[in-house]
């Protein structure tokens, strides 16, 4: 399987990514195939506007119920907000994946 070369984010997360305040993304199984060491082009989901490149550092499975304050800090939000956002995007999904990255 070929690793994905593109990643999208809601535009509301762009500033935090560019500022280095958001260093992970939590995705469902359909987006678990990113490979550590690869670089992806990042664009806004709404407009498809490219705004940076990210190097994938790790991809780790996690249960929704195991999310904690450390994950929230890496997402630059409170744990309560993080869980609300994830439920909004992936309603009812328990198995998720934490993708850690750095801007290049």
UniProtKB/Swiss-Prot annotation:
Q: Does the keyword Hydrolase apply?
A: yes
**Record CDD domains:** ASCH_yqfb_like
Q: Name one GO cellular component term.
A: cytosol
Q: Which organism is it from?
A: Vibrio vulnificus (strain CMCP6)
Instruction: Output this protein's name.
Output: N(4)-acetylcytidine amidohydrolase
Q: In the UniProt record, does the keyword Hydrolase occur?
A: yes
Q: Known Gene3D superfamilies for this protein?
A: Hypothetical protein
Family affiliation: Belongs to the N(4)-acetylcytidine amidohydrolase family.
Where along the chain is the active site annotated? 22 (proton acceptor), 25 (nucleophile), 75 (proton donor)
Which segments constitute the ASCH domain?
Answer: 7-93
Domain of life from the UniProt record: Bacteria
Q: What does this protein do?
A: Catalyzes the hydrolysis of N(4)-acetylcytidine (ac4C).
Q: Provide the reaction this enzyme catalyses.
A: N(4)-acetylcytidine + H2O = cytidine + acetate + H(+); N(4)-acetyl-2'-deoxycytidine + H2O = 2'-deoxycytidine + acetate + H(+); N(4)-acetylcytosine + H2O = cytosine + acetate + H(+)
Q: What is its EC number?
A: 3.5.1.135
- Which cysteines does the record link by disulfide bonds? none
User: In Gene Ontology terms, what is one molecular function of this protein?
Assistant: hydrolase activity, acting on carbon-nitrogen (but not peptide) bonds, in linear amidines
